């Protein structure tokens, strides 16, 4: 079907505003269902099909029958240890086949799932546990030593001997079996209840809990899956490499695939050989990736060790970081039969907001240089950051979105919520972009200045606070610069106190000891002063531009 048959993008002037809507018709969002009910609907018909399988040899797998069974068992188990509606349970697990079972079980119990990076520092995990007022933590051996002193009970998934004092996962499920499967709590989860509390740096650079309801996530799944062909149910194999503690990992990969009764091939960490072996052995069809992985597929000699001529891979999607045109071209030359799609999403909007190809039969495929088109049920506008006025097509402004997927707010942060979601329900993303006449959206800049290192968000303000805690640092600024492998890397400029003699390497090491590995400062310069505006705001753009200019080879 050609573009001529595709309905045009809808543009309306709403109270003198330029509001853009999807070129596709609205999709129905079922009332009254929770995320687990929506995702596992029809699981009994696929009871013997593998739903989740770990890519590593000998890894755990779950059939749909086992996912449904253990989700219900874990929900009962949580109730038995005192978890009630609205209680937060922090999950500090790496990507494992059991991860979706844990998260869906938490939601089924009426509780709130809050994923955290298991490889973050103990202090960072404890901060999230305390800020979210969590009642429990679920962890395995990777993070147990970091969470055991967080002040709440820990459910240990894995080797009990390596997690002394933890509540046994297996023992808890066995005890739940003895309570009976027919027990229904009087305060069962409702669609309007919160079900997830992921943490995001948002537009301010300070990590905070994003309150998402069952309705938020169900509506986002309905919009993002609008073009999935029903006849492919039970057939799609998706790679689960993106971290499951991230909203895209748990919703866009796990929940979407389980809803469609496909298989998620779970990978904990990226290793090129393991990754390529998973693509070949598991016949992966869809792989959400970050650009550094695609770069390795194109440039690493390891890829030549595999026969990639018969891959089942149909498409890859990048969403966590911009895709360089040169990398896109190189990837398409090496894998000409694989469609490359980009998407745009944010935690505050429950996941995907804009995407590329709509699928066979839906006609419109967004331009490669864009982040996609507006999904059904969404409204988008672009506003002048200074005046707040909405702008017509082809005019850059801050991207704002309104839909049923917009968060309920930031947890315990009313003022920040009001700055991010206005009185008319518009979510202000902090990203600058525009929409063209075909309805394709382009992101051209970021107001929020977050650094995206290998798909992970790194907040300059957080690193600046660590730098300023160093006794020899008087002032500091952090910004991101482009990097071929990582997407962006954090660079710091610091002003030393009078008489201080510490060098650049010593200060970099000081920061590295206090933050997760992906947040480390990669380059540091000693400077005389940090440029700031009249109001005292750091002029990161100026620093960034000057740094890039210095790094360019002279003609």
Curated annotation (Swiss-Prot):
GO terms for biological process: fatty-acyl-CoA biosynthetic process; phenylpropanoid metabolic process; sporopollenin biosynthetic process. GO terms for molecular function: 4-coumarate-CoA ligase activity; ATP binding; long-chain fatty acid-CoA ligase activity; medium-chain fatty acid-CoA ligase activity; trans-cinnamate-CoA ligase activity. CoA binds at residues 269, 454-455. The keyword Ligase applies. Residues 271-342 are annotated as: SBD1. Keywords: ATP-binding, Ligase, Magnesium, Nucleotide-binding. This is 4-coumarate--CoA ligase-like 9. It comes from Oryza sativa subsp. japonica (Rice).
């Amino acid at each position: 079907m050609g573009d001529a048959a595709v309905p045009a993008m809808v543009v309306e002037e709403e109270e003198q505003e330029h509001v853009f809507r999807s070129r596709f018709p609205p999709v129905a969002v079922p009332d009254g269902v929770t995320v687990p009910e929506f995702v596992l609907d029809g699981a009994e018909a696929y009871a013997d099909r593998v739903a989740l399988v770990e890519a590593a040899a000998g890894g755990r797998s779950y059939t749909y029958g086992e996912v449904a069974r253990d989700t219900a068992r874990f929900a009962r188990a949580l109730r038995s240890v005192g978890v009630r509606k609205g209680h937060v349970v922090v999950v500090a697990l790496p990507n494992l086949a059991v991860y979706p079972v844990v998260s869906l079980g938490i939601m089924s119990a009426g509780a709130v799932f809050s994923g955290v990076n298991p490889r973050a520092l103990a202090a960072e995990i404890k901060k999230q546990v305390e800020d979210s007022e969590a009642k429990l933590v679920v962890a395995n051996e990777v993070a147990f030593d970091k969470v055991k002193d967080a002040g709440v009970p820990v459910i240990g998934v894995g080797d009990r001997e390596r997690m002394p004092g933890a509540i046994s996962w297996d023992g808890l499920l066995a005890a739940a079996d003895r309570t009976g499967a027919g027990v229904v709590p009087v305060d069962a989860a409702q669609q309007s209840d919160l079900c997830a509390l992921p943490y995001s740096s948002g537009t301010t650079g300070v990590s905070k809990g994003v309150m998402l309801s069952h309705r938020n996530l169900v509506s986002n799944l309905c919009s993002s899956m609008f073009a999935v062909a029903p006849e492919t149910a039970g057939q799609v194999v998706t790679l689960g490499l993106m971290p499951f503690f991230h909203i895209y990992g748990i919703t866009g990969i796990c929940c979407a695939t389980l809803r469609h009764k496909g298989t998620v091939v779970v990978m904990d960490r990226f290793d090129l050989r393991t990754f390529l072996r998973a693509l070949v052995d598991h016949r992966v069809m869809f792989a959400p990736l970050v650009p550094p992985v695609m770069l390795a597929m194109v440039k690493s000699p390891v890829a030549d060790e595999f026969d990639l001529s018969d891959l089942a891979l149909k498409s890859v999607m990048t969403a966590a970081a911009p895709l360089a045109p040169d990398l896109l071209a190189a990837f398409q030359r090496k894998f000409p039969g694989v469609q490359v799609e980009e998407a745009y999403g944010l935690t505050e909007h429950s996941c995907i907001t804009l995407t590329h190809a709509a699928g066979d039969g839906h006609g419109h495929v967004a331009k490669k240089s864009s982040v996609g088109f507006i999904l059904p049920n969404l409204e988008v506008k672009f506003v002048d950051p200074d005046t707040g006025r909405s702008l017509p097509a082809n005019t850059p402004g801050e991207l704002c979105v309104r839909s049923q997927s917009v968060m309920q707010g930031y947890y315990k942060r009313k003022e920040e919520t009001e700055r991010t979601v206005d009185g008319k329900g518009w979510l202000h993303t902090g990203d600058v972009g525009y929409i063209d006449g075909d309805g394709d959206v382009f992101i051209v800049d970021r107001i929020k200045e977050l650094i995206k290192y290998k798909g992970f968000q790194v907040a300059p303000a957080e690193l600046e606070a660590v730098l300023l805690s160093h006794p020899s640092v008087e002032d500091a600024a952090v910004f991101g610069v482009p990097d071929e492998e990582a997407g962006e890397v954090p660079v710091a400029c610091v002003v030393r106190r009078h008489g201080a003699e510490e060098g650049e390497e010593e200060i970099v090491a000081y920061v590295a000891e206090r933050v997760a590995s992906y947040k480390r400062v990669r380059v540091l310069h000693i400077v005389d002063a940090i440029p700031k505006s009249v109001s005292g705001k750091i002029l990161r753009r100026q620093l960034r531009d000057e740094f890039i200019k210095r790094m360019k080879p002279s003609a």
